[in-house]
């Protein structure tokens, strides 16, 4: 819903918000999952389901990413040229603990001005 609202606000998606959400119009720009396991490798292997096929429950010590984002193809005719070729994902890495979770990336910048300021330092 948040991504659809944002894409509508800047004019990339047009039409009735509820209809855009219902038809999953965001998927043109969000063609990936919400995250993945994080471990020994950047995209750690591991099943998202248990042996019965049900969603696997989180256990203390697991680390997952939460990384919503969008990618706007240069080939999309219905999109204004100023948006074409843009891609962004702002990731959080989350450690599952015995009592809940800990956002390992909580001190990293998330707001546009903060990200741009950080980019100027590299």
What spans do the regions from the language model cover?
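Active-site neighborhoods and metal-handling regions in enzymes and metal-associated proteins
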Residues: 1-122
